[in-house]
């Protein structure tokens, strides 16, 4: 909707505010993450927690059994009972394994399922809250890219923090608590001494969590900015391509991902440092325990067995505490990610769409009154739009608001819809303040048709059904008939089920508009608000739609913002608004009586523009200003056929200016229809990506990785070495007193040394792998983005390459790939080193026993493999389903005004929840299977222990090994097993990462059919600007069944102006798309100065052309940067060039009058400027480029008479000596063209000057002009 100059500068303040809060890294208390749990979730969490406690206590219980074993072996090593005694203990191991299977299953399954369910609730609550916010919130605090980023990226962190990681955390803590309880029972004094290390551990852990949270918040903030760059670039790809802005987009994207990379390194280093300190503290405390334990044996009569039991239990308990660090990291990341989402969820909107309080009457009459209204847009509170504005519209009357662009006309509509509340004064309906009504009810009585209708990426039928809950097919059909849309819909292959594409790009402008009107008609409103509702239609459609509107307007209060003569002239009341004041009001004939009044001046303005070809009478009649339109086909200007238009991608509020153009003719079938049916066959299934391929991308970091590998290997060997030390200590404890004293001191020192090693090794390992992983992600993201930006335009017509989906791919997928390289490699090396050193130590101690255990290793291997298999989580299918769900969110947030005005919030939520059902079911299934795999793996492990000790007893019985060697083998292998089991915790990540890698490499490997990064091709020294289209035939790749051009020939001489005229959908804008090589013709050729376009360097070719579309796409940056974009970057254009271009485009004056001038930020999609203002900025952007060829696609259609005159003057100055191709409906523009070409049925039906064509009796042009004349009378 045209915001009438509202709100520049908003995003400026927003940028500052977010960056400040991010610095402080705010988080949510952990328990608050579970705020959305229902009773079933609570049940699951209780079961899961009980399972986790059971699972955790198994380890200390196992150490008790282990104490029994030491006793059994120690006391019976020389007698025949050893096998009997030991086998009894072994049986207990098997029972414990069974118990652990059940507990582990409950732990994993319950927590994974509840995590999936609650994350889904948070996502859906977040979207629900976003939809209920007042429109001002979207102007100031958020944008589509951020919402989609939070829903796809941040919820992954939140789910991570509330799913199986919680179970794991409870398990580890209960191991710790259970262990210490048993240790106190066995030997309290020694346990107390060992406990002294706990405060140090806690401090290290807390410091680490703090640092990690800080870094991760900073990283998320940088990624959110990068996501916005992706959203803006992909969403406006035609503009980016036309202005060769790819490089600029890539650079700003790289800037943000580099700052995210820096945060990730800090995060890695902090984690490593924390771990290193923890392990150092552990080892020092063991040193203390060994020295002190020796003392206890000598002085307090402890036995060696009990000392070892206490040490082992405390080791096991404390180690489990150390393993909580990934959980703590995940909690910290989840808490940081949840902060922004929960803040939003808690936010109470100023105008609440879900508020059920307020009056609900039987019906309303429809008297509308604005009483002494003071208003400024929230994004620019200092700039008053209205300062005491009043207006009364009696029920059933039609009131027309006219005035220049930016005067506040659309603001009236915004206030009546209650998108905003006035600062002072009131807006009344039937004498009751709007604030007193129930918002949903009063909005249901108001129908809105904007100048730039917003459609959702679903079918035509679903789009119309937004107008009314539970509408029947019959009602929908009647509404399409009334809106004159039934005919073109029936011509589409899928009829009402045709998909309209992202933002309706599959339809031409007029088609979109008629669907929007049908949607409003279905609502059967008492008050109808038409914001330029017919401006986008060609004469023929306009006549029929206007008749439809006339039928619909009967007995309804109607407020029209328009420039069209016919609409305004018959209005009961016309109000002329200037700079937020009503300067005149009355009927058409009353206002004309004052020959120096504002209205008469507007009309005169129009006459000059119009040329003098129309009869003065109609001129006068002229309402506001569109009468001059030869509106020949505005309807679609669009591009006829594909998604064309440049703007289209702009999407939402762009004012489109006239809305429309974006679409294409749908002459038949939505562009993507063919594919939808077949299930988008166009996309081949993703090829698997080999790990070597990803590793190759990490090549530059080989030195870092090698060093990291060495460090990780040292780190991995630490625990098995620890095993030798413990078995040596056991031995020492059974030695004579003086030897015991000496040995205990010696081994204590060795332990401290081991701790110091860990202190150096751990942070180095984390840091080195963070550098390698971070650089890899950054490289993959920039390669992928760079590749995507250079794809041919038709690639973006595919739904799977929409801006929302691409944003999710770049943020989520790239981060997952890192798990394959950095973290996973680091862990794999560490675990391999643990395993290898464990085996070596075991074999040296007792090769027979080690061999027996080794034979059983495959069992452990199989169980590890099963775990990996079971954890194949979040399969590709679920991933793309969530992508589809985020597209629903993307659409709704981008079109929040439409959603609000149709009270469609619940409908959007239903669509969103429907898209999420599948992935949630998959998550539940996956949780169930993972739980089984996880439990089973523990059972196998315990069976292996039981078998090993039984075999050991046999060997001891036969005298083949000694009791100390048995334990050395056991400790070395246990420690190795702990290493191996840790690596399986990375299983879920690697499978997700492979799917992610495939989706990213699918983009990197694709060859662009029209590659703007390709530097080859001819560059002409001197461009004259002769263009020739020879025998073109063309269909849009996404709709191969619809022929746009059959055999089109057209010659455009250098320096001349050619106007293309024709009905909506005839292919006029397609000519412009082909000239810029957004698409290539199927046959025939286009030449520039005799050279075929395909032979010219693409980037150079696009630099020779300046495009001004009817729906200009501006970026969320300053006005200066938007104009300089024409040169390719802000640095390339000097201040004087920018100002000169703005003056030429008649934009300098309005820019200078805004507080921040050229530094004003235009807002997402330029929403802070009115239509006419945006258009002038776009013209300045094209002028700065100094193009040889100018392409004007309805460039002035969105302007009021005054701006149009000025812009038209500017364009007249600019087109001198330039080859110009104009798609237009204004008689004046077309009439003065050197050649007018009529496009019809895929060929040029007539061409010549206005004078020659008008004389052809029964000619297409002559009849169009005739139709126009009668329409204006």
Swiss-Prot record:
Q: Which residues form the ABC transmembrane type-1 domain?
A: 45-333, 705-992
Ranges of residues in domain ABC transporter: 368-604, 1027-1266
Q: Where is this region: Disordered?
A: 1-20
Q: Which domain of life is it from?
A: Eukaryota
Where this protein primarily resides, as one coarse class? membrane
Q: How does this chain sit within the bilayer?
A: Multi-pass membrane protein
User: Which cellular component appears as one GO term in the record?
Assistant: extracellular region
Q: Which residues are glycosylated?
A: 470, 555, 631, 648, 801, 1116, 1217, 1247
Enumerate the subcellular locations listed in this protein's record, separating them with semicolons.
Membrane
Q: One MF term from GO for this chain?
A: ATP hydrolysis activity
**Which UniProt keywords are present, listed alphabetically?**
ATP-binding, Glycoprotein, Membrane, Nucleotide-binding, Repeat, Transmembrane, Transmembrane helix, Transport
Q: Per its UniProt record, what Pfam families does this chain match? A: ABC_membrane, ABC_tran
List residues traversing the bilayer.
42-62, 93-113, 169-189, 192-212, 272-292, 301-321, 706-726, 746-766, 840-860, 927-947, 961-981
Residues annotated as binding ATP 2: 1062-1069
Q: Where along the chain is ATP 1 bound?
A: 403-410
Q: Which family does it belong to?
A: Belongs to the ABC transporter superfamily. ABCB family. Multidrug resistance exporter (TC 3.A.1.201) subfamily.
In Swiss-Prot or TrEMBL terms, this protein is called ABC transporter B family member 12
Provenance organism: Arabidopsis thaliana (Mouse-ear cress)
């Amino acid at each position: 909707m045209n915001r009438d100059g509202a709100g520049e500068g908003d995003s400026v303040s927003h940028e500052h505010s977010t960056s400040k809060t991010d610095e402080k890294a705010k988080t949510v208390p952990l328990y608050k993450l579970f705020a959305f749990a229902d009773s079933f979730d609570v049940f699951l969490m209780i079961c899961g927690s009980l399972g986790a406690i059971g699972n955790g206590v198994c380890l200390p219980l196992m150490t008790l059994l282990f104490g029994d074993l030491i006793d059994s072996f120690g006391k019976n090593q020389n007698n025949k009972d050893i096998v009997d005694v030991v086998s009894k203990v072994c049986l207990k191991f098997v029972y414990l394994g069974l118990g652990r299977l059940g507990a582990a299953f409950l732990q994993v399954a319950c927590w994974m399922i509840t995590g999936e369910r609650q994350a889904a609730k948070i996502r859906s609550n977040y979207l629900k809250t976003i939809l209920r916010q007042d429109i001002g919130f979207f102007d100031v605090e958020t944008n589509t890219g951020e919402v989609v980023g939070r829903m796809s990226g941040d919820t992954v962190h939140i789910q991570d923090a509330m799913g199986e990681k919680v179970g794991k955390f409870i398990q580890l803590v209960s191991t710790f608590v259970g262990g210490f309880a048993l240790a106190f029972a066995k030997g309290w004094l020694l346990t107390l001494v060992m406990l002294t290390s706990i405060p140090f551990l806690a401090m290290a852990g807390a410091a680490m969590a703090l640092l990690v949270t800080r870094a991760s918040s900073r990283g998320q903030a940088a990624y959110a900015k990068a996501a916005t760059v992706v959203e803006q670039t992909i969403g406006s790809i035609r503009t980016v391509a036309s202005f060769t802005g790819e490089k600029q987009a890539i650079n700003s994207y790289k800037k943000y991902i580099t700052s995210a990379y820096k945060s990730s390194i800090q995060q890695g280093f902090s984690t490593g440092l924390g771990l290193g300190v923890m392990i150092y503290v552990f080892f020092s405390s063991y040193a203390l325990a060994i020295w002190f334990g020796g003392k206890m044996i000598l002085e307090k009569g402890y036995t060696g067995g009990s000392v070892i039991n206490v040490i082992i239990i405390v080791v096991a308990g404390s180690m489990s505490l150390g393993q909580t660090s990934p959980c703590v990291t995940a909690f910290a990341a989840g808490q940081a990610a949840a902060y922004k989402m929960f803040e939003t969820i808690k936010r109470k909107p100023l105008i609440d769409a879900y508020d059920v309080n307020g009056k609900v009457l039987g019906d309303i009459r429809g008297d509308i009154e604005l009483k002494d209204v003071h208003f400024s847009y929230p994004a620019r509170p200092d700039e008053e739009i209205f300062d005491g504005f009043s207006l009364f519209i009696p029920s059933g009357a039609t009131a027309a608001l006219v005035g220049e662009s930016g005067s506040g006309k659309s603001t009236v509509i915004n206030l009546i819809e209650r998108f905003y509340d006035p600062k002072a004064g009131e807006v009344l309906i039937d004498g009751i303040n709007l604030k007193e009504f129930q918002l949903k009810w009063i909005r249901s009585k108001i129908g809105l048709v904007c100048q730039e209708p917003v459609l959702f990426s679903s079918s035509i039928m679903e789009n119309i059904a937004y107008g009314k809950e539970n509408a029947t097919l019959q009602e929908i059909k009647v509404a399409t008939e009334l809106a004159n849309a039934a005919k073109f819909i029936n011509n589409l292959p899928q009829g009402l089920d045709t998909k309209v594409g992202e933002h309706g790009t599959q339809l031409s402008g007029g088609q979109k508009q008629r669907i929007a009107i049908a949607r409003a008609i279905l609502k059967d409103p008492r008050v109808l608000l038409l914001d330029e509702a017919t401006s986008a239609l060609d004469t023929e459609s306009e006549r029929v739609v206007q008749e439809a509107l006339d039928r619909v307007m009967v007995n309804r209060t109607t407020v029209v913002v328009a420039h069209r003569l016919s609409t305004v002239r018959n209005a009961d009341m016309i109000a002329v608004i200037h700079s937020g004041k009503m300067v005149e009001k009355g009927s058409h004939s009353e206002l004309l009586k004052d020959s120096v009044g504002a209205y008469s001046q507007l009309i005169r303005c129009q006459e000059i523009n119009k040329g003098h070809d129309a009869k003065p009478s109609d001129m006068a009649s002229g309402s506001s200003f569109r009468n001059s339109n030869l509106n020949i086909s505005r309807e679609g200007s669009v591009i006829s056929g594909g998604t064309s238009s440049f703007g289209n991608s702009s999407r939402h509020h762009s004012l489109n200016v006239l809305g429309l153009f974006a679409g294409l003719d749908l002459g038949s079938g939505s562009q993507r229809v063919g594919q939808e049916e077949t299930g988008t066959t166009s996309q081949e299934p993703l090829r698997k990506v080999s790990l070597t391929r990803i590793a190759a991308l990490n090549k530059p970091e080989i030195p870092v990785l090698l060093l990291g590998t060495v460090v990780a290997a040292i780190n991995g060997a630490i625990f098995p070495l620890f095993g030798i030390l413990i078995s040596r200590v056991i031995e020492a404890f059974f030695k004579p007193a003086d030897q015991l004293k000496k040995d205990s001191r010696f081994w204590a020192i060795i332990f401290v040394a081991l701790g110091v090693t860990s202190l150096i090794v751990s942070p180095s390992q984390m840091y080195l792998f963070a550098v390698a992983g971070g650089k890899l992600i950054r490289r993959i993201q920039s390669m992928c983005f760079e590749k995507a930006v250079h794809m041919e335009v038709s690639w973006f017509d595919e739904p799977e390459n929409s801006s929302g989906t691409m944003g999710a791919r770049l943020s989520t997928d790239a981060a997952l790939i890192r798990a394959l390289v950095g973290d996973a490699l680091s862990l794999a090396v560490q675990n391999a080193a643990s395993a290898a050193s464990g085996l070596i130590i075991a074999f040296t101690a007792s090769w027979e026993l080690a061999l027996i255990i080794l034979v059983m290793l495959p069992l452990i291997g199989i169980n590890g493999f099963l775990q990996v298999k079971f954890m194949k989580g979040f399969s590709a299918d679920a991933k793309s389903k969530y992508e589809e769900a985020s597209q629903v969110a993307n659409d709704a947030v981008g079109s929040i005004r439409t959603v609000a005005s149709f009270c469609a919030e619940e409908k959007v939520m239903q669509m969103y929840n429907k898209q999420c059902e599948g992935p949630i079911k998959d998550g539940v299934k996956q949780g169930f299977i993972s739980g089984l795999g996880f439990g089973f793996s523990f059972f196998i492990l315990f069976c292996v222990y039981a078998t090993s000790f039984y075999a050991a007893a046999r060997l001891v019985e036969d005298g083949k090994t000694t009791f100390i060697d048995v334990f050395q083998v056991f400790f070395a292998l246990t420690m190795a097993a702990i290493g191996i089991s840790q690596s399986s915790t990375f299983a879920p990540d690697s499978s997700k990462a492979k799917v992610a890698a495939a989706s990213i490499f699918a983009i990197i490997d694709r060859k662009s059919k029209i590659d703007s990064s390709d530097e080859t091709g001819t560059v002409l020294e001197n461009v004259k600007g002769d263009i020739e289209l020879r025998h073109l035939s063309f269909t849009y790749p996404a709709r191969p069944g619809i022929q746009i051009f059959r055999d089109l020939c057209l010659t455009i001489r250098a320096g001349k102006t050619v106007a293309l005229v024709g009905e909506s959908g005839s292919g006029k804008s397609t000519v412009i798309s082909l000239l810029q090589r957004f698409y290539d013709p199927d046959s025939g050729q286009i030449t520039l100065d005799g050279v075929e376009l395909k032979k010219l360097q693409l980037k150079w070719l696009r630099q020779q052309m300046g495009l001004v579309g009817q729906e200009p796409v501006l970026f969320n940056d300053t006005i200066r940067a938007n104009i300089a974009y024409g040169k390719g970057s802000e640095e390339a254009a000097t201040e004087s060039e920018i100002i000169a271009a703005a003056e030429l485009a008649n934009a300098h004056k309005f820019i200078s009058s805004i507080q921040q001038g050229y530094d004003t930020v235009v807002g997402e999609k330029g929403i802070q400027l009115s239509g006419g203002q945006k258009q002038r900025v776009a013209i300045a952007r094209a002028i700065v480029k100094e193009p040889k060829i100018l392409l004007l696609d309805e460039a002035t259609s969105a302007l009021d008479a005054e701006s149009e005159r000025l812009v038209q003057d500017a364009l007249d100055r600019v087109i001198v000596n330039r080859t110009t191709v104009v798609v237009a409906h204004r008689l004046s523009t077309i009439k003065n063209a050197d050649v007018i070409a009529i496009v019809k049925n895929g060929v040029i039906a007539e061409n010549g000057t206005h004078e020659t064509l008008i004389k052809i009796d029964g000619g297409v042009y002559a009849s169009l002009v005739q139709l126009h004349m009668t329409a204006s009378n």
